[in-house]
């Protein structure tokens, strides 16, 4: 099917690749169907775009934690595992939402400014069932390694 995204333009969406967030994403509960896009010219994408198929104006920029030098371990409840229909840990993909901070004192151009990652509220997606959740309110411990 064709989809007209405000950010990505007119794109082709294979309906078998649609990711469902059964409860939506917090504050966007009405958006349950998403498509994950990336730059196909890059063998290992640095960034992904999660486009809502329920609202053409909603697109999130995402990155895999390891592309940002972050190692993630998340504990999921039995309810979350069931909701995702996970077959095992290897079936789960973790993605971090990227955003531009609203810093009025910054002199940089709003489009060219640095991105930050939301570490406390990652997305967890089952690769086999294509179901997702946003795991909210994580407390982050940072382990620093010295040379």
UniProtKB/Swiss-Prot annotation:
Transmembrane segments: none
Highest taxon, organism lineage: Bacteria
Pfam families membership: FliW
UniProtKB keywords: Bacterial flagellum biogenesis, Chaperone, Cytoplasm, Translation regulation
Residues annotated as signal peptide: none
GO cellular component, one term: cytoplasm
Entries under InterPro entries matching the protein: Flagellar_assembly_factor_FliW, Flagellar_assmbl_FliW_dom_sf
UniProt GO BP: bacterial-type flagellum assembly; regulation of translation
Cellular compartments annotated: Cytoplasm
Assembly notes: Interacts with translational regulator CsrA and flagellin(s).
Function: Acts as an anti-CsrA protein, binds CsrA and prevents it from repressing translation of its target genes, one of which is flagellin. Binds to flagellin and participates in the assembly of the flagellum.
Family: Belongs to the FliW family.
Name listed for the protein in its UniProt record: Flagellar assembly factor FliW
Organism: Chromobacterium violaceum (strain ATCC 12472 / DSM 30191 / JCM 1249 / CCUG 213 / NBRC 12614 / NCIMB 9131 / NCTC 9757 / MK)
């Amino acid at each position: 099917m064709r989809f007209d995204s405000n950010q990505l333009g007119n794109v082709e969406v294979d309906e078998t690749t649609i990711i469902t967030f059964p409860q939506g994403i917090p504050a966007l509960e009405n958006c349950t169907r998403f498509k994950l896009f990336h730059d196909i010219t890059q063998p290992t994408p640095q960034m992904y775009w999660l486009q809502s198929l329920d609202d053409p104006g909603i697109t999130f920029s995402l990155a895999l934690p390891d592309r940002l030098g972050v190692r993630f371990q998340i504990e999921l409840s039995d309810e979350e595992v069931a909701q995702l229909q996970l077959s095992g840990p290897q079936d789960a993909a973790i993605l971090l939402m990227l955003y531009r901070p609203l810093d009025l004192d910054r002199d940089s151009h709003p489009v060219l400014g640095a991105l930050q990652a939301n570490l406390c509220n990652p997305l967890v997606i089952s690769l086999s069932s294509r179901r997702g959740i946003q795991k909210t309110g994580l407390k982050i411990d940072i382990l620093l390694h010295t040379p």
